[in-house]
């Protein structure tokens, strides 16, 4: 078992707590990453949003990929699990970017968390088309094939509904062979079919152990039917540490009660 944490690129992760004592700044996250290595953490997940959906759209948010490149240069053991949304990145260019960061970090420390987008307002404000749910997954499927094959082949060409690549060469290849680890999560049938075929690890939100167990069983069976290596799994969770269970439950109620006046409330359920 390995342990990681979400890098506070938005200044924390609680929508209704204005100041969590974490800055959305390079200075803060770089110190945190180096300290987390000393404490024995295995990885950090670097979320990707151009607007801050936690503290409100006017609040600062760090760019995922430039932050990952910088962290690769100042850390030595921490896996950098960088979120990427295919609607915001051309696959050939992202494949090149990722391979370069993999060399900066060394030791196969770069991995991808592929997210098929969810925030319509952000896409509109940044001039990106926001497609319907299943169309986004169809795009992601093409995107993943191009990225994977460019990491493994040269003089690669592809013609699909969403992307076209003509005789592309990508050098240097990633240090991680056969490719950097690809994580993804999702509950829909389209998501699970895509992930079981094209990804290496399935990540889930925290849930009752019985439900997590069922998700693991389902994805493992899908993977086995495809004749692919066993799927890896990850679960996200919050840790609340207090002196008594009563205090812990009180804190749980406080941090999960998202009020309408919270700066990030407007984006809370925008799928």
Residue ranges and their predicted role:
Residues 23-36, 94-97, 184-194:
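Short, acidic/polar
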Residues 13-27, 83-92, 129, 176-187, ...:
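Active-site mouth loops of central-metabolism enzymes
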Residues 4-9, 34-38, 126, 132-176, ...:
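An alpha-helical appendage that flanks or caps ligand/catalytic pockets
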Residues 3-5, 44-46, 79-84, 110-114, ...:
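Hydrophobic faces of well-ordered beta-strands that scaffold small-molecule active sites
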Residues 50-54, 58-62, 87-92, 208-214, ...:
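Acidic-and-aromatic substrate-binding clefts and catalytic sites of carbohydrate-active enzymes
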Residues 1-74, 159, 173-180:
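N-terminal beta1-alpha1-beta2 module of alpha/beta enzyme domains
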Residues 3, 36, 40, 71, ...:
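Conserved, mostly hydrophobic/aromatic
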Residues 37-38, 68-77, 98, 102-110, ...:
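Acidic (Asp/Glu)-rich catalytic clusters
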């Amino acid at each position: 078992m390995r342990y990681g944490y979400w890098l506070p690129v938005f200044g924390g992760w609680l929508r209704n707590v204005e100041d969590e004592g974490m800055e959305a700044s390079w200075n803060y996250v770089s110190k945190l990453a180096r300290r987390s290595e000393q404490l024995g953490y295995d990885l950090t997940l670097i979320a990707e949003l151009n607007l801050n959906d936690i503290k409100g759209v006017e609040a600062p948010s760090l760019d995922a990929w430039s932050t990952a490149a910088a962290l690769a240069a100042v850390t030595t053991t921490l896996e950098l699990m960088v979120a990427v949304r295919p609607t915001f990145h051309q696959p050939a260019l992202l494949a090149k970017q990722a391979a370069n960061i993999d060399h900066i970090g060394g030791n196969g420390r770069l991995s991808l968390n592929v997210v098929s987008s969810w925030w319509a307002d952000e896409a509109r404000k940044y001039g990106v088309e926001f497609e319907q749910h299943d169309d986004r997954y169809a795009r992601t499927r093409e995107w993943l094939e191009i990225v994977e094959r460019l990491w493994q082949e040269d003089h690669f060409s592809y013609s699909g509904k969403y992307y076209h690549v003509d005789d592309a060469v990508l050098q240097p290849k990633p240090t991680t062979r056969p490719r950097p680890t690809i994580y993804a999560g999702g509950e829909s049938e389209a998501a699970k079919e895509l992930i079981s075929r094209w990804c290496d690890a399935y990540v889930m939100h925290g849930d009752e152990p019985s439900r997590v167990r069922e998700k693991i069983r389902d994805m493992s069976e899908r993977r086995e039917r495809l004749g692919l290596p066993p799927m890896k799994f990850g679960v996200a969770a919050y840790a609340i540490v207090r002196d008594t269970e009563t205090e812990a439950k009180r804190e749980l109620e406080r941090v999960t009660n998202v009020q309408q006046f919270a700066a990030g409330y407007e984006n809370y359920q925008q799928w």
